């Protein structure tokens, strides 16, 4: 009811307004008074709608007429620049807005968006006026424009269907050169099919992209932590067969290849990896597994040496036999490949033979080279000219003989792999600045090759500063201490040097006395404190010796309590003789027995009155060479590095 009232009201209002307007329009000119009516927003909208309906009713047949496009203009001779512009307009997918009055302006009401544009045939070979070179240039330009169109279609598919960002889609598309050409060729080939004979290029290109499952594959590869650069390279490697990528990745995952190494295995295993038979790849994996490479190691090995996947089975067998003939067993070979996977597939046979022959020049046999490579296979990755020869010359400069170089190679082969200028030379210069001569430095390196692997600023310098400031070693003796025991530079300050220093200070040894003891016997700071306590307790309580004897002979702590100190002290007590600690311990058993007999004979002769006390020989007549010789024969079991 309310709706009916409103309609009646609007109808009456509109009739009244229309009648008033008609009266106003048909009024006589002689009329003196003109009544002008003002319309509000509601009435004026009704008036405008009424007039529009009247105009449409006057020509009812005009709206049913169909638009007939004008005939195409005759072909005109255009210069190269205009031809390129028109060519691009005829190929691009998205049209740029044209200014009013443009010849090739397009509107959204066109039935075919390309109806107002010139045909591509108008440019290529319809007339024989242009020469062949110009036509070839136009064909090349047409292909470039079509390639740009294909890129835009691929980018649009990634953004709309794959929900990728514009930046990511652009980065992927810009690197898909081969795949763009593949899509362009396949889209052109679809025009031969009846169902696509009348379709446009854009539709055919989208059909090719959808049928190849391109967008889901990109999403799947991104899920496997592959960068857009590697995704594009892998897709280009497939040559349009995108299904082979999924099959290959599933196989790599079956042998435990993970993360970014999946892309590494693709890109470094050769262009034919997607065409290889899976049975051949499984045969290679099983052969390596039978020679010591565990199944759970296989992903690590293949991910870091994907060249294995490009080898034939015969070449893999020859490479494995190359190392097994050097005396390696299967366990050594398996651990060697796991430690350095490149050794099995990255280097050629000529390069490996050359490096093995160079290692033999140090005096190593074939079996020793095999054990060396099994222990440190990274040697195979070092260059002879850039690493080994400069290092050998530097060792000769320090006075290290060939045997010393061989010992360094066997004990610490990693020294032949590190950089000479950045790692080794600064440490040698630091030792030279402490006053250590080159020959002594060479002996230090032969004795303790690990010195060159320690950090200069985190290990070596802090230990030197500790010896100077906390252990009482003077600047005059610091070079001597380091030269005598370079292993000190590899000790931890917090767990080894600091506890030992505090223990000696707790015994009553003064700061400067401790420095003198260390200068005399630097290994004092490297012993285990738990092994030092029973020796000191026996010295003070059983032997009843003063602390000064220990200060004068700090090597006392280097001898075994059960095998040397207690047996010799027992012999001295039984024979009622006494020696200083130096002459009691720093000799062999035969020499000690001879000294005891001589001491007993002198005492008996003195008691018999045959010799005076002044005529008895002193113990100081024993030379330091005998002490040094006996120290070399002593087994220092209490020392812990």
From Swiss-Prot:
Question: Where, subcellularly, is it found?
Answer: Plastid, Chloroplast
What are the protein's UniProt keywords? Chloroplast, Plastid, Transcription, Transcription regulation, Transcription termination, Transit peptide
UniProt xrefs under Pfam families: mTERF (PF02536)
For this UniProt entry, the molecular function terms from Gene Ontology, in alphabetical order, are: double-stranded DNA binding
Using the record for this protein, list the coiled-coil segments as residue ranges, or answer none.
Answer: none
Q: Which InterPro entries match?
A: MTERF, MTERF_sf
Question: A GO biological process this protein is involved in?
Answer: DNA-templated transcription termination
Q: What happens when the gene is disrupted?
A: Embryo defective. Developmental arrest of the embryo at transition from the globular to heart stage.
Q: What cellular-component terms does GO give this entry? A: chloroplast; plasmodesma
Asked whether the UniProt record includes RNA-binding among its keywords, one would answer no
In this chain, the stretch annotated as Disordered covers: 54-80, 606-641
The free-text function statement in the UniProt record for this protein reads: Transcription termination factor involved in processing of plastid transcripts. Essential for embryogenesis.
Entry similarity comment? Belongs to the mTERF family.
Q: What is this protein called?
A: Transcription termination factor MTERF2, chloroplastic
Source organism per UniProt: Arabidopsis thaliana
Which lineage? Eukaryota, Viridiplantae, Streptophyta, Embryophyta, Tracheophyta
